Each structure stands twice: as structure tokens, then as C-alpha cells.
């Protein structure tokens, strides 16, 4: 029995979900998301709730049960409230700015790092050392943040680099004489 999959997903006001030809579509005030459904699970929309159940007792079907339910819940929250993550930049001279549809970062390299902002993502820089990534697709917001962090991950000696807000960096002591 899936402890995640057995709970129905409640639909907030203004969110509608339709299932057509194995594709689940969620529409809300912030936009629309689509997701192909696995043939191993059955998805039913009724009474303002989405219920996911496995089609058989196989292990793969039970795995997809909880995964599908979690993905549907993420889509519902995305089209109703959206997702946002904040990155912090630490380091002397390290900064970021949005120029047109690109994010330009100075991260201590001999060149600027230019990151084209993907469709469906909004990036803002309130301060030169802070990057806010917003969107309706939780997976895409997390992926963009991971790609930005990968340009210069925080190093353990001084903590310089790009990190998530609130992320604890494991620090090391420098060498001793």
C-alpha cells in the first residue's frame, strides 16, 4: 500500500484537471502544465479531487502510484501558487544581473557566465548577490537552480560560490604552519 498514493489530491478553486489520451493537463491562474500518465496507473477526477490508483498488483505499478500522485500534487500547486527558489552568491566581485532574456554572472572566471533563461522560468536579481528563480513547473525550477549552482559550487575553505538560500556549507580548516 502506497502511503503517498492513497491520499487524493484536492483541487483548489480555479484549478481544473483533465485527462485525455493518457495526458493529464492542469490549468490554473498561473498557466497550464501537461504530463503523460503511465499505463500502470489509473487517474480519476471527481468531486474536486484527483485519485490515483494502480491497475494491478505488480511492484512497478505500485511504484508509479505514489510517483504519479506526487507529480499531480506538484502540478496543482504549480498552476495555483507557483514555485520559487533563491540562490546566494558569495565571493569578492561575484555578482549577477539579468540582461534581456539572459542571466549574466561574474563568478571569478576570465569571462562572464551567460545563462539563457528557459521558457516558463522568471529570474530576478533583487541584489547583485541574490538570484530568485520562479516558475510553475517544480522540476524545471529545481533544474535551473542546479545548473546555476553548478557553474561555481561553494568551496569548503572560504565558502565562495553559488549556493541555495539557507544551504549549510561544510567548512574545512586551512593548512597550518
From Swiss-Prot:
SUPFAM superfamilies: Ribosomal protein L6. InterPro entries: Ribosomal_uL6-like (IPR000702), Ribosomal_uL6-like_a/b-dom_sf (IPR036789), Ribosomal_uL6_a/b-dom (IPR020040), Ribosomal_uL6_bac-type (IPR019906), Ribosomal_uL6_CS (IPR002358). PROSITE patterns: RIBOSOMAL_L6_1. It comes from the Bacteria. GO terms for molecular function: rRNA binding; structural constituent of ribosome. The keyword Ribosomal protein applies. GO terms for biological process: cytoplasmic translation. Keywords: Ribonucleoprotein, Ribosomal protein, RNA-binding, rRNA-binding. Coiled coil: none annotated. One of its GO terms (cellular component) is cytosolic large ribosomal subunit. PANTHER family: 60S/50S RIBOSOMAL PROTEIN L6/L9, LARGE RIBOSOMAL SUBUNIT PROTEIN UL6M. Belongs to the universal ribosomal protein uL6 family. HAMAP family: Ribosomal_uL6_B. This protein binds to the 23S rRNA, and is important in its secondary structure. It is located near the subunit interface in the base of the L7/L12 stalk, and near the tRNA binding site of the peptidyltransferase center. Part of the 50S ribosomal subunit. This is Large ribosomal subunit protein uL6. It comes from Acidiphilium cryptum (strain JF-5). The gene is rplF.
Amino acid at each position: 500500500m502506497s502511503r503517498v498514493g492513497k491520499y487524493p489530491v484536492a483541487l483548489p478553486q480555479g484549478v481544473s484537471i483533465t485527462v485525455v489520451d493518457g495526458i493529464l493537463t492542469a490549468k490554473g491562474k498561473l498557466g497550464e502544465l501537461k504530463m503523460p500518465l503511465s499505463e500502470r496507473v489509473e487517474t480519476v477526477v471527481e468531486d474536486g479531487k484527483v485519485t490515483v490508483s494502480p491497475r494491478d498488483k505488480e511492484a512497478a505499478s505500485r511504484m508509479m502510484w505514489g510517483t504519479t500522485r506526487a507529480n499531480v500534487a506538484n502540478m496543482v500547486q504549480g498552476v495555483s501558487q507557483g514555485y520559487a527558489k533563491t540562490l546566494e552568491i558569495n565571493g569578492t566581485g561575484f555578482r549577477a544581473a539579468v540582461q534581456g532574456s539572459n542571466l549574466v554572472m561574474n563568478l571569478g572566471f576570465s569571462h562572464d557566465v551567460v545563462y539563457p533563461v528557459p521558457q516558463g522560468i522568471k529570474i530576478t536579481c533583487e541584489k547583485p548577490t541574490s538570484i530568485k528563480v520562479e516558475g510553475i513547473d517544480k522540476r524545471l525550477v529545481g533544474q535551473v537552480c542546479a545548473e546555476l549552482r553548478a557553474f561555481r559550487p561553494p568551496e569548503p575553505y572560504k565558502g565562495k560560490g553559488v549556493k541555495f538560500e539557507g544551504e549549510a556549507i561544510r567548512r574545512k580548516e586551512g593548512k597550518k604552519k
